[in-house]
Amino acid sequence: SDASEPAPACVVMYESWRYTTAANNCADTVSVSVAYQDGATGPCATLPPGAVTTVGEGYLGEHGHPDHLALCPSS
């Protein structure tokens, strides 16, 4: 299947009305994208350990609420 696997639990997603943010609490660098409840996925973002970054629109955006963070395929 084309469905990407969920990001590990040590990558935490925070949502607000404006942004969806990911925090990497893992020991390794991870590349994640937001999977929205409507089936859309956002662009991939690479987070080194300890990084916190905006990974997509918040719940007032085009795709509504994020569902989870998904791992991006390794290039």
Swiss-Prot record:
Cystine crosslinks: C10-C26, C44-C72
Summarize the protein's role.
Inhibits mammalian alpha-amylases specifically but has no action on plant and microbial alpha-amylases.
Q: Which Gene3D superfamilies match?
A: Alpha-amylase inhibitor (2.60.40.20)
The record, for SMART domains, names: A_amylase_inhib (SM00783)
Keyword Disulfide bond assigned:
yes
Keyword list (alphabetical) reads: Alpha-amylase inhibitor, Disulfide bond
| Name of this chain's protein | Alpha-amylase inhibitor Paim-2
Keyword Thylakoid belongs to the record = no
Q: Where are the transmembrane segments?
A: none
InterPro entries, from UniProt?
Answer: A-amylase_inhib (IPR000833), A-amylase_inhib_sf (IPR036379)
- GO MF term set: alpha-amylase inhibitor activity
